[in-house]
């Protein structure tokens, strides 16, 4: 018996395992047929494939080359665990969700806010919600524009039917009288924008500390001329409220000015630029008149009810309420007719 037979009988490993580089083929045995017949399969109790699994796997099962090399080199490991190492199955790959077309939803199906929205989209949505425009026409965008003045709102502004005018004053005419006469031609408020020319006589009102007026004679250049005549609250366009002021420069360089309290005689042809606009003060007054008339009618009705309850005959005829209304309106019209046709400039 030679050495190779002794190794086969003693049960030691008498075969080689030649593995290729690919590692896909089954192991190859070298030895006599008797030695190959002396090999027997040992059941592997710990094998996950049951007791029928053998030490050598099928060609479809590939072992670990590192374990096979270690087993062949050491010769101490059993042959049934040398090369039958099965790789674990790969983890189930998640099927990628197909992206839907269109804009992503803002809210999920359960009502929660979707996290797919970026921070930029959220930042752009928030200001739009805070600056959301209300319903209806925005204030101040109608036909009747309103302009804020000191402490109140004017019913109409200069942008409503504003019209410029040029007043030409000849030499020797009163500039103040020309402007006042122009303001009384219609129910429009006026304002003096600018003036150019020279005056020979100017009467200016002194401050309240020294009441009175001072008359200046000579040649003075007009630096500025300003005024605004607003329709009075009684509705008469001939009764205006306002004051005319002027600034003059003397030939020696002095500047004088103040409210005009007398004639302002032109020394050269003077041009005055005036702007006229509609101010709806009479409309407010008409509303007040309607309220007063309704109050008078209410009082007369109350008196009639009291007289009927006392079973007394009222000496006042039935047409008296209408007569009172007509008489009050007529009296006011008479007052309007006898209103001053000119503005007293001495009142300031």
From Swiss-Prot:
The subcellular location is:
Nucleus
Where does this protein have compositionally biased stretches of type Low complexity? Answer: 47-60, 112-131
Q: What residue ranges carry the coiled-coil annotation? A: none
Residue ranges forming the DNA-binding region read: 98-110, 132-144
Q: Which domain of life is it from?
A: Eukaryota
Pfam families the record matches: PCC
Asked if the keyword Glycosyltransferase belongs to this entry, the reply reads: no
Q: List the Gene3D superfamilies hit by this protein, alphabetically.
A: Hypothetical protein, similar to alpha- acetolactate decarboxylase, domain 2
Query: In chain numbering, where does the motif Bipartite nuclear localization signal fall?
Result: 98-106
- An example Gene Ontology molecular-function term: minor groove of adenine-thymine-rich DNA binding
Instruction: Describe the function of this protein.
Output: Transcription factor that specifically binds AT-rich DNA sequences related to the nuclear matrix attachment regions (MARs).
Domains: entry comment: The PPC domain mediates interactions between AHL proteins.
Q: What is this protein called?
A: AT-hook motif nuclear-localized protein 9
